[in-house]
Design a protein with these regions (language model features):
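Sec-dependent signal peptide recognition
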Residues: 2-10
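Short secondary-structure boundary segments
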Residues: 4, 20, 144-146
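Extended, compositionally simple hydrophobic/Ser/Thr-rich segments
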Residues: 33, 40-53, 90, 95-100, ...
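C-terminal motif of bacterial Sec signal peptides marking the signal peptidase cleavage site
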Residues: 13-16
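Short linear S-[DN]-x-LW-Φ motif typified by the pepsin-like aspartic protease active-site region
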Residues: 18-89, 95-101, 193-197
């Protein structure tokens, strides 16, 4: 088990450093640009970015990074999904940053590393599917939350108030959620799930992982 854990962490660290030590060198001259996109309701990322999303009108995207690196970052919408990925490897002292406004966000899908923070969610359903070692934070309100975490992800959604929550956590991931009514959770490997709220809990733990209740803030 220790060998598997060590290998998982090495893979995660490799993903996190992928754009830092290899590829086209950044110029060091920071530049911002606006990008016009079609409508989308989900975001998919591949790589290590620093992304801040606010659920509000109007839709907007601003990207900041070294001026010679920005053309290497693709932001395209397909089937209502905004895909953010690198067209080539590059080397920079800090990750490319994106600020995004979108009227309604229903899901985030990420592979690789980086940070992604979402605020202002208010809808009936929200989905998170992560593979790699990103740090994810989400806040707001939703009726149903689904979280699928693999690798060494760190996902904090305890400020996303949800009635019903489903969590499937694998690898060395850490997931925090808030569930008011029902929580169905499956843990595999040394992953860790922390929940708040008074939900009825159905849990399956395979291996040394754990499911832990934490008192809600202010209680």
């Amino acid at each position: 088990m220790k060998r598997i854990l060590h290998l998982t962490l090495l893979i995660a660290l490799g993903a996190a450093c992928h754009v830092i030590h290899d590829g086209v060198p950044g110029s060091g001259k920071l530049q911002k640009e606006k990008r016009n996109l079609g409508p989308f309701t989900s975001i998919s990322t591949e790589g290590a970015f620093d992304i801040a999303v606010v659920c509000q009108k109007p839709q907007d995207l601003e990207i900041e990074g070294d001026d010679n690196i920005l053309p290497l970052v693709s932001t395209e919408v397909s089937n209502n999904v905004l895909h953010i990925k690198n067209l080539r490897n590059y080397s920079t002292s800090s990750p490319v940053a994106l600020k995004i406004s979108v009227p309604d966000l229903m899901g985030i899908y990420s592979s690789g590393a980086g940070k992604l923070e979402v605020s202002g969610v208010k809808n009936d359903k929200f989905e998170i599917d992560i593979n790699g070692a990103p740090t994810i934070r989400v806040s707001g309100e939703t009726k149903a939350l689904s979280v699928d975490a693999k690798g060494a992800a760190k996902i904090d959604t305890h400020k996303l108030r949800a009635a019903r929550v489903e969590v499937d956590s694998k690898g060395v991931s850490t997931v925090e959620v808030y569930a008011a009514e029902q929580l169905d959770v499956t843990v595999s490997g040394p992953s860790h799930v922390i929940y708040r709220g008074d939900a009825v809990v159905n849990k399956t733990v395979n291996g040394p992982g754990s499911v832990e209740k934490k008192e809600s803030e202010g209680s």
